[in-house]
């Protein structure tokens, strides 16, 4: 019989109690990355984690690597451009070969939404989805939740808060994972984008950024995923920015909550997604999200490998 283990493929894999546990542990690490217990370091010392990223990444792959090392584990990053995948080896065969080497966990990112679910069917070690197509990016949603949890003080305080997602919602796995998670926690959600960037949904939608800003306590800006577009939607990114950039002027004129906070999963297109002045504003939580990425991924790895 195959050994049973926990995977993190989507946020619904976690119960509310488990999410609270991760928030508690990640909060400790966010306050002090060195707050790893000696017992945890000893248990993680011989753990080997493999990162299989079939799509480019800066923040996610780096924070998983740093998280692994801070816990005391070792991480192997496979360069897909120089691996046998570039010679025509299938995703499944690449995964099975790495899996046969018996790592303690595998972190994967792939352009196909179904990829991690397919691989999890025969994985006998914890599998973490670090981004799959347009469907899911669970650790990003968890680190974003940690950022909101820190700002508002508790999950109870988050209930009823209003968040607007602005940008390419349809093609954003970050938005998809966040929406599913935040709905569970009682937040009110609005999507703001041109028609071609909006999914079919029962959620509130608008094409008007001013309306979204007026609605929100939290603004989540999303980049335009041009690599997933079949045809240009705007003549240029500048034209898109003219319609959907979060600017100081727009915040001043339309934000009903003057303490509205701004998030972005990165990479940020400066002065297209968010105006540079807004990124430097104290209401911007973008770099806090990056820091929290390490803390939350430390908590996730510890949870899956040790608990």
From Swiss-Prot:
L-aspartate binds at residues 87, 173, 223. The keyword Zinc does not apply. Its EC number is 2.1.3.2. Pfam families: OTCace, OTCace_N. GO terms for cellular component: cytosol. It catalyses: carbamoyl phosphate + L-aspartate = N-carbamoyl-L-aspartate + phosphate + H(+). Transmembrane segments: none annotated. The keyword Transferase applies. Pathway: Pyrimidine metabolism; UMP biosynthesis via de novo pathway; (S)-dihydroorotate from bicarbonate: step 2/3. Carbamoyl phosphate binds at residues 59-60, 109, 137, 140, 266-267. One of its GO terms (molecular function) is amino acid binding. GO terms for biological process: 'de novo' pyrimidine nucleobase biosynthetic process; 'de novo' UMP biosynthetic process; amino acid metabolic process. InterPro entries: Asp/Orn_carbamoyltranf_P-bd, Asp/Orn_carbamoylTrfase, Asp/Orn_carbamoylTrfase_sf, Asp_carbamoyltransf, Asp_carbamoyltransf_Asp/Orn-bd. Keywords: Pyrimidine biosynthesis, Transferase. Catalyzes the condensation of carbamoyl phosphate and aspartate to form carbamoyl aspartate and inorganic phosphate, the committed step in the de novo pyrimidine nucleotide biosynthesis pathway. Heterododecamer (2C3:3R2) of six catalytic PyrB chains organized as two trimers (C3), and six regulatory PyrI chains organized as three dimers (R2). Belongs to the aspartate/ornithine carbamoyltransferase superfamily. ATCase family. This is Aspartate carbamoyltransferase catalytic subunit. It comes from Helicobacter pylori (strain HPAG1).
